[in-house]
Amino acid sequence: MSIPLLNYSLSTQNQRVDGYEVSPGEEQPRAYNTDNLPSAVEMDEVIWAAYRQIFSEHQILSSTSAPYLESQLRFNQIKVKDFIKGLILSESFRKLNYDVNNNYRFVEICVQRILGRDVYNEREKLAWSIVIASKGLESFINMLIESDEYEENFGDSIVPYQRRRIIAQRSKGEMPFNLKTPRYGADFKEKFGMPQFIWQGPVRQFRPQEQRPKAGDPALFLGMVNDLATV
């Protein structure tokens, strides 16, 4: 008997705010899709957008390319949804993301890149981590891609993207996922012996040589005056 998905509450996120923009600006994400029989150039853009979404820009390598899946997508043998699933389940994605992270962080990465939103809370991380531990990686990916949330927002033909990163009601948008969630977590950085740039002593202020006070400048005597004032 399989363990049911643990219930978790929702939290306030931009993607839960309905948009009523008449003409969205260039800051809004572009939805790449194959609805209108794209040309060869447009199909290249769709494929590139899929790689950029799933592997993020810092993981797009020659080893992550999937020419067989690309060929199937170009000849309409599979849908964009199948292409996304193939990239997620590829060996290269597993090595770059699953093998170097714990289940909680891997859940966060997959929710961001597949569903286009951040995790709601720690309980959602726990719920999906239990799925990975009990049913395996492939079942976890299938549950995300076959979910109602994915179907309502992306369907079979749209490349996932970060939903509603910028809304008119707020002066600042949410941080892009590729900047918010780097490849390694803090625990794996320590495990791999990566340098931690932590200064042990006080950080002194640096002043360029041309801005240093010269002989006769009253600023040279400012420190002495302050010392006298405190006595």
From Swiss-Prot:
Has UniProt tagged this entry with the keyword Chloroplast?
yes
Pfam families referenced in this protein's UniProt entry, alphabetically: PBS_linker_poly (PF00427)
Gene Ontology CC terms, in alphabetical order: chloroplast thylakoid membrane; phycobilisome
Indicate the family of this protein.
Belongs to the phycobilisome linker protein family.
Assembly and interaction partners: The phycobilisome is a hemidiscoidal structure that is composed of two distinct substructures: a core complex and a number of rods radiating from the core.
BP term (GO), one: photosynthesis
Keywords on record = Antenna complex, Chloroplast, Membrane, Photosynthesis, Phycobilisome, Plastid, Thylakoid
* Family matches, as PANTHER family: PHYCOBILISOME 32.1 KDA LINKER POLYPEPTIDE, PHYCOCYANIN-ASSOCIATED, ROD 2-RELATED
Which purpose does this protein serve, as stated in its record? Rod-core linker protein required for attachment of phycocyanin to allophycocyanin in cores of phycobilisomes.
Q: Which InterPro entries match?
A: PBS_linker_dom, PBS_linker_sf, Phycobilisome
- Where is this chain primarily localised? plastid
Q: How does it sit in the membrane?
A: Peripheral membrane protein
The PBS-linker domain extends over 11-191
Q: Where in the cell is it found?
A: Plastid, Chloroplast; Plastid, Chloroplast thylakoid membrane
Recorded protein name is Phycobilisome rod-core linker polypeptide cpcG
Task: Name the encoding gene, please.
Answer: cpcG
